[in-house]
Amino acid sequence: ALVEDPQMQKYHKH
């Protein structure tokens, strides 16, 4: 899971 992951919405694209 990276920044572009629907499951991990806690990560926002910078």
Swiss-Prot record:
Native organism: Solanum lycopersicum
The protein, known as: 23 kDa cell wall protein
Keyword Secreted in annotation: yes
GO CC terms in record: extracellular region
Alphabetized UniProt keyword annotations: Cell wall, Secreted
Subcellular location: Secreted, Cell wall
